[in-house]
Amino acid sequence: MTTFTKPLSKLIGHFEKFPGIGPRTAQRLALFILKQSESSIRDFSKALLEAHSNVGHCKKCFNLTSEEECDICRNAERNQNIICVVAETKDLLALERAREFKGVYHVIGGLISPMDSIGPEILEIRSLVERVSKSEIDEIILALTPSVEGDTTSLYIGKLLTPFTKVTRIAYGLPMGSELEYVDEVTLARALEGRTNLI
């Protein structure tokens, strides 16, 4: 078994904490970093710190942004009366790649999962209800992962929002447990077109 010097092992360990990064990929990334010039490493470190310090959440939809409101919420050409609810920013990005949805979003920050001690109170569901209750919203589209957690979250949100507006859920041409970020653009576009009433 290959052993690395302590600083290199530490660097590999940090990369292994990244989602989807296994030991081999972490090792490749660490070795790549070591081949870079000192100025490149400084630039990389600066970019990491700047992103961490300056990127926060949109006060309206909780998408990532460096402004008070994200570009989508500030875009006058977007339909502000249709809100697509997603679990994470990565799901929003996947839907934007499909170029089908012309409304705005609400990022709730995860899915209800009692097994992982994630209840609705720690997600941005209350802010969604407030947003809908104070505005003229024509439709809420739930675009949550097809899983037990996604279904639970969709039903919970649906019951809260149905008194205020129409609530639909995107159709799925993918198996249970699939992540939205890995679904191709055509499938996502069709899922939006084929959405159905939740309740």
From Swiss-Prot:
Record bears the keyword Zinc-finger: yes
Protein family per UniProt: Belongs to the RecR family.
Name of encoding gene: recR
Pfam families registered for this protein in UniProt: RecR_C, RecR_HhH, RecR_ZnF, Toprim_4
Record-level Gene Ontology MF annotations: DNA binding; zinc ion binding
Cited SMART domains: TOPRIM
Protein name as catalogued: Recombination protein RecR
InterPro entries referenced in this protein's UniProt entry, alphabetically: DNA_Rcmb_RecR (IPR000093), Rcmb_RecR (IPR023627), Rcmb_RecR_Znf (IPR015967), TOPRIM_dom (IPR006171), TOPRIM_RecR (IPR034137)
Source organism per UniProt: Prochlorococcus marinus (strain MIT 9515)
Zinc fingers (C4-type), renumbered ranges: 58-73
Upper classification of the organism: Bacteria, Bacillati, Cyanobacteriota, Cyanophyceae, Synechococcales
Domain Toprim: residue ranges: 81-175
Key words, A-Z: DNA damage, DNA recombination, DNA repair, Metal-binding, Zinc, Zinc-finger
One record GO biological process: DNA repair
CDD domains on file: TOPRIM_recR (cd01025)
Functional summary from the UniProt entry: May play a role in DNA repair. It seems to be involved in an RecBC-independent recombinational process of DNA repair. It may act with RecF and RecO.
PROSITE patterns: RECR (PS01300), TOPRIM (PS50880)
